[in-house]
Amino acid sequence: MAEQAHDLLHVLLFPFPAEGHIKPFLCLAELLCNAGFHVTFLNTDYNHRRLHNLHLLAARFPSLHFESISDGLPPDQPRDILDPKFFISICQVTKPLFRELLLSYKRISSVQTGRPPITCVITDVIFRFPIDVAEELDIPVFSFCTFSARFMFLYFWIPKLIEDGQLPYPNGNINQKLYGVAPEAEGLLRCKDLPGHWAFADELKDDQLNFVDQTTASSRSSGLILNTFDDLEAPFLGRLSTIFKKIYAVGPIHSLLNSHHCGLWKEDHSCLAWLDSRAAKSVVFVSFGSLVKITSRQLMEFWHGLLNSGKSFLFVLRSDVVEGDDEKQVVKEIYETKAEGKWLVVGWAPQEKVLAHEAVGGFLTHSGWNSILESIAAGVPMISCPKIGDQSSNCTWISKVWKIGLEMEDRYDRVSVETMVRSIMEQEGEKMQKTIAELAKQAKYKVSKDGTSYQNLECLIQDIKKLNQIEGFINNPNFSDLLRV
């Protein structure tokens, strides 16, 4: 009887189609498979074709299944996920396809597919339509937030900022301070720290209001899952707990796993052997993430600043990181620079393993949320170079609140880069090493059996079962062994 109940549990996960969202969703998919669920991972057709190592993931998790649906754009058209038109296309085109997919699992018997009907949906927090469809079909739905609790709370505070007259701001000053958001954020948040295109809001626009409505609709879900932990963001988790039925802080989610997942970029593992040849804490790791683009001039300023610092560095040079037509010439110039064993350039790196390597002593980062959590978990101080989205406020918290990194902001010149690299790898970095080491210790405890992130994950699993009114389920006896504790 217990096995029959076990076989009925089928969770569908649907992330926003960007690496920074897909990665933590894949982590959650693996964790739910470890707990004994059938899991369907839903991606766009475009990104599904780009995923690497799917066969390895499928072999490790037989209960994990992949589906894909159209995002409304032709296969050969570039995807600009920051363009409101792309977001609108997904919401309009994908909604009926999503509904049909859920219905198809009801129509086709589990004997034919080997999988039961969908009994729970976990959707990206910035999507409203999966909640609409799940409610229509009477399927329990949860929202998963892949950015910080702080940034999530700002979505709910934007209407109050409009009411108070702080938005829109006609003077064009994106550094204008915002007040009344929360005591712990007073004097720290600026207009450019707001979600979406609100950072540049000199008038109210429909796409801005729609983006907020899409995300705040997540409060209708059965609960909010967050990739964070309470010691890091306790005040904002507390505020979100007054908005949502339930919250589950399960971060750093990658630290709950013993295995590594696939992604949209092919990792070059040769850099790990190179790191083996370097002294402890002697290497600066440089990566602008999966989405950020910089100009050729900015790239060369970073490059020469790193060279002038005299420190060893590992540079992730994504194939599409440079804006403009002179990308090939700039990249050629970099690769023709004599390394003399001091540096290495790769197209994409296994970031978690790199940060965890004893040779890495600093991280020059775009300050995406996944990168921050991975750096904290590894105990590596950061140089923060924010560009888009939540990265600006992340930078403020790294440098001013948590004091685990330096704030570069818009100073993309070689002198600033050289100065900050020297600082993070020398005297100032030593102080931050102690601070972030303590935070890393807390993060490690949170994902242990006695930690709140581990317990919140178990609570989520139990709540999914309860919402499906399945009782007598016997926990996977190997579940604890499959987690990194």
UniProtKB/Swiss-Prot annotation:
Report the top EC class in one word.
Answer: transferase
* Active-site residue list: H21 (proton acceptor), D124 (charge relay)
Keywords attached to this Swiss-Prot or TrEMBL record, sorted alphabetically, are:
Transferase
A single Gene Ontology MF term assigned here is: quercetin 3-O-glucosyltransferase activity
Which residue spans traverse the membrane?
none
Name the reaction it catalyses: mogrol + UDP-alpha-D-glucose = mogroside IE + UDP + H(+); mogroside I-A1 + UDP-alpha-D-glucose = mogroside IIE + UDP + H(+); mogroside II-A1 + UDP-alpha-D-glucose = mogroside IIIX + UDP + H(+); mogroside II-A + UDP-alpha-D-glucose = mogroside III + UDP + H(+)
Highest taxon of the lineage:
Eukaryota
> What does the entry state regarding organ or tissue expression?
Highly expressed in young fruits 15 days after anthesis (15-DAA).
Residues the entry annotates as binding UDP-alpha-D-glucose: S290, Q351, W369, N370, S371, E374, D390, Q391
Pathway assignment: Secondary metabolite biosynthesis; terpenoid biosynthesis
For this protein, the Enzyme Commission number is: 2.4.1.350, 2.4.1.-
Q: Coiled coil where?
A: none
Keyword Transferase listed: yes
- One Pfam assignment: UDPGT
Q: Any further remarks?
A: Mogrosides, the major active constituents of S.grosvenorii fruits, are a mixture of cucurbitane-type triterpenoid glycosides that have been proven to be powerful and zero-caloric sweeteners and can hence be used as a sucrose substitute for diabetic and obese patients.
Q: Which family does it belong to?
A: Belongs to the UDP-glycosyltransferase family.
Record's function text: UDP-glycosyltransferase involved in the biosynthesis of cucurbitacin and mogroside tetracyclic triterpene natural products (e.g. siamenoside I and mogrosides IV, V and VI). Cucurbitacins have cytotoxic properties and exhibit deterrent taste as a defense barrier against herbivores. Mogrosides are nonsugar highly oxygenated compounds used as high-intensity zero-calorie sweeteners; they also possess pharmacological properties such as regulating immunity, lowering blood sugar and lipid levels, protecting the liver, and acting as antioxidants and antitumor agents.
Which named protein is this?
Mogroside I-E synthase
What's the source species for this entry?
Siraitia grosvenorii (Monk's fruit)
